[in-house]
Amino acid sequence: MHLLPELASHHAVSIPELLVSRDERQARQHVWLKRHPVPLVSFTVVAPGPIKDCEVTRRIFNHGVTALRALAAKQGWQIQEQAALVSASGPEGMLSIAAPARDLKLATIELEHSHPLGRLWDIDVLTPEGEILSRRDYSLPPRRCLLCEQSAAVCARGKTHQLTDLLNRMEALLNDVDACNVN
């Protein structure tokens, strides 16, 4: 289920392309939920800027896939089906996991908090009925910015930071993980 970094497109996506990609992801999620009546993990990489598919995002994605598989194995949860693809919005993974949806969401939230790359992952958990479990459902604060203590959404909306600073931080986090062989 890993993606080859050297095959990244480096395509700069437009807002309309991102919106179409989001709609296509939702359609894929509904197909998966019909095929497997268990919770679905939908996994993407948080990638600021117009280039969503590059070597860095694919490497970050691959670490996330490894971490999600390890989480399922550690918990004794069966992965019924898994797939990876690349859309206009970058690398995407889907895993149908036989586990209680709320337990799965709490475990993925912990993974996002505890893994050095977790801040760069967007891990959604959908119930078998298609409900997306949110951080708000657990009274958790919104995601923090990569560079400061503000909410990531506030900084993104206000364009508080330079894109190059955000991308450099992403790459530094990735290089630290690779240097330490963290999975």
Swiss-Prot record:
Transmembrane segments: none annotated. Its EC number is 2.7.7.61. This is Apo-citrate lyase phosphoribosyl-dephospho-CoA transferase. It catalyses: apo-[citrate lyase ACP] + 2'-(5''-triphospho-alpha-D-ribosyl)-3'-dephospho-CoA = holo-[citrate lyase ACP] + diphosphate. It comes from the Bacteria. Coiled coil: none annotated. Belongs to the CitX family. The keyword Cytoplasm does not apply. GO terms for molecular function: holo-citrate lyase synthase activity. GO terms for biological process: prosthetic group biosynthetic process. The gene is citX. InterPro entries: CitX (IPR005551). Transfers 2-(5''-triphosphoribosyl)-3'-dephosphocoenzyme-A on a serine residue to the apo-acyl carrier protein (gamma chain) of the citrate lyase to yield holo-acyl carrier protein. Keywords: Nucleotidyltransferase, Transferase.
